[in-house]
Amino acid sequence: MSENDKSEKMKKEGIDYSKMGLMSGLEIHQQLDTGKLFCKCSGYLRQDEPDFVVKRKLHAVAGETGEIDSAVEHEAALDREFYYQGYNDSTCLIELDEEPPKQVNQEALDEAIKIALLTNCEIYQITQVMRKTVIDGSNTSGFQRTFLIGHDGYIETSFGKVGIDSVALEEDAARIVEKDDKKIVYRLDRLGIPLVEIGTAPDMDTPEKMKEAALKIGEILRACKVKRGIGTIRQDVNVSIKGHDRVEIKGFQDPRMMVETVDKEIVRQQKELEQGKKMGEVRNAKEDGSTEFMRPMP
């Protein structure tokens, strides 16, 4: 029986999510409608031909622990080349990782604080810019700058409260304009646009509760100075059932797809457990509700 058939069978019979030990959470990334986060560039996307292209490659090296991250090693083994397109009048040395970042954009910081307050978070009185490793070439620096704004918040749903673990402000990645097995071409116009990341607690025990939480957070974001349209918001789902490691599913544009996708992911994880597998990984959401492997979990 295929995953689709099993998912349909489970729908008809009623899924006992509690018995399965379903744990799920959301990560929502929303672009802010301000200038870029660490430079003075405007942050609008361009369709005209770029003025220049820079080529680079990823090299896997050991981190502070003395070990090479498995996800970095996986990407480096692909031996891909990364090309970065830029413009003479709207791309700066910071975006090329040839100059240190400037002071954080105050307008973006104010909007992030507003979102944290609207999700009932405690605001950090002191915060520090951190660096998250990025392995797919979408950040010229090899990492993403991010800092925490709020913590321990919540939103109300008809299923009860959903915890908000954190609200962070970070920089968006460059956007892909061309890709094949050995090459990815990025455009630098999106790199550095401010993103607010909202991470919920893993306390949603049904897909319907997750969908409602995503819609509620969307309402809050639309009350703030955010960009609108396709690609300006990205929603990721973290899912696990009893005995299986966490799986991150990326690429949701419509929260209504979450219910079907989570049901199919439950079937997939059940099948893996039957085969003696339980490893976490990162997967990409597809329009039919299925998912496909992207990379190992970092």
What residue ranges belong to the model's regions?
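Basic, nucleic-acid-interacting segments
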Residues: 2-298
